[in-house]
Amino acid sequence: MIDDQRDMQVDSVNQEENVDSGETKQNTVTEVPRTVLQDVEANIAALMQATKQRDPRLVYRSLRTTSNICHRLNADVLGQLIKKYYSFDNSLKNELLELIDMPQNGDDSSTSITNGNGNTIFPEVDMYLQLLLSMTLYYNEKYEVGAEYIKKVIARLQSYDRRTLDQIAAKLYFYYILFFEKCNRSVECRNTLLSVHRTASLRHDSETQAMVLTLLLRNYIQFNLYDQADRLVSKTSFLTNASNNLAIRYQYYLGRIRAIQLDYTTAHEHLVSAIRKAPNTVYAVQFLEAVYKLHIVVQLLMGEIPERRIFRQKSLEKTLVPYLRISQAVRIGDLCAFTDALSKYEAEFRFDGLYTLICRLRHTVIKTGLRMISLSYSRISLRDVCIKLGLDSEESAEYIVAKGIRDGVIDASIDHSNAFMASNEAMDIYSTEQPQQAFHERIQFCLALHNDSIKSMRYPMDAHKSELEGVEEARRRMDKEMAEADLDDDEPDLGEF
């Protein structure tokens, strides 16, 4: 009996193991990676659901995977999608098939997708497929063909008036400006973008409005039209509910405009905000390179030295070498090293569009060198100052020393008769208001970060109503208990005192 029971237990354990192994095998079989066509079909189904429910969040979920899908697309998949969703219009279908060099089959038996109102395709699905085709043309470097094609797409997009098209339209306008930039025709887009921005503001299309605003600033900065960009910023407002990528681009463009206008403190705040909000992914490396380059120059113009950890980041180490040389020259106040670095990396600085700002650093280098001389020597001749700073004459050294004293760079005096500079005793910085101001700036930043974090949180809909109902229920229950207490006659008579 005992042996039989043991055999039964062993058999039951083996059966359970077989069942578990069968389940794991079944799970491994079901976990099959989806094809590109299935991913596109899933996004299209989500777009159709978003159209019926009028929920823009479903559109956002569909667009999140679009960039990954686009790099996996090929002509066969696009041809299947075009034949399926544009079977109602042979002329449009043939035009789209020509763009991807796909042969046209006359006997196509694909069924068209209707939206239930007599139309043959949802506008959201139509624009999504046009977006996929535009991205494919761009990544295949067919810029001239793509520029002419996307003009027709934009004209077709403007014929629709759907709130659910907001995020797809923003993507289309982004590739619209990219195509024309590659063809050196971005000036042609300016009037179109201005009219689109006005229309988006009237319709309250937040994503399109934010995207077009950043594209206009990009266009103005590309042609050095900083005054027009500043007027555009002053007459418009950036919506807070726009996506994070648009917000950091807007902050970067604002920082660039303010730096050109000599407002380095405001530019520094915008650039720090862009760096902190930027995603730490591979796709954001080039954007971070541009932001860090401008941020380093702005810091140097403010009289600050960038931290060395910025130049030691693996993804930015090679591209920031020219700016490291400039920072080292500014830190030690070596005008000769600064001039050598400026001439050696002039091509890189002009390509980044920062050559003008870096040329302004010459005065900063001279001031830094003058400050170090003042701290090192209690008394030094103007001729030695001229030699150490690499100036042309003693008159130039005397002028620079006098200007440094007037601007508060150094605390010294000039003996014109004997031609020397005498430094005064250094004052304790903790006796001034500078530590208090620095501490105040840090507190302000922490408070602003706390407020932004609270604003970015998502709260459940009508949560306050449930709290009010709970308070009302508690109040009714308390009133009922008080009424029952008044009707209670079981208390003993206290009598007379």
From Swiss-Prot:
Q: Where is the composition biased (Basic and acidic residues)?
A: 470-483
What is one cellular component GO term in this UniProt entry?
A: proteasome regulatory particle, lid subcomplex
Q: Where is this region: Disordered?
A: 1-27, 470-497
Q: What is this protein called?
A: Probable 26S proteasome regulatory subunit rpn3
- List the molecular function annotations (GO) for this entry: enzyme regulator activity
> Could you state one GO biological process linked to this protein?
regulation of protein catabolic process
What does this gene product do? Answer: Acts as a regulatory subunit of the 26 proteasome which is involved in the ATP-dependent degradation of ubiquitinated proteins.
Q: Which family does it belong to?
A: Belongs to the proteasome subunit S3 family.
Give the PANTHER family listed for this entry. Answer: 26S PROTEASOME NON-ATPASE REGULATORY SUBUNIT 3, 26S PROTEASOME NON-ATPASE REGULATORY SUBUNIT 3/COP9 SIGNALOSOME COMPLEX SUBUNIT 3
Q: How does it assemble?
A: The 26S proteasome is composed of a core protease, known as the 20S proteasome, capped at one or both ends by the 19S regulatory complex (RC). The RC is composed of at least 18 different subunits in two subcomplexes, the base and the lid, which form the portions proximal and distal to the 20S proteolytic core, respectively.
Keyword list, A-Z: Proteasome
Task: Give the InterPro entries listed for this entry.
Answer: 26S_Psome_reg_C, CSN3, PCI_dom, WH_DNA-bd_sf
Q: Which gene encodes it?
A: rpn3
* Biased amino acid composition, Acidic residues: 484-497
Give the organism, scientific name: Schizosaccharomyces pombe (strain 972 / ATCC 24843) (Fission yeast)
Q: Where is the PCI domain?
A: 248-428
Keyword Lipid biosynthesis listed = no
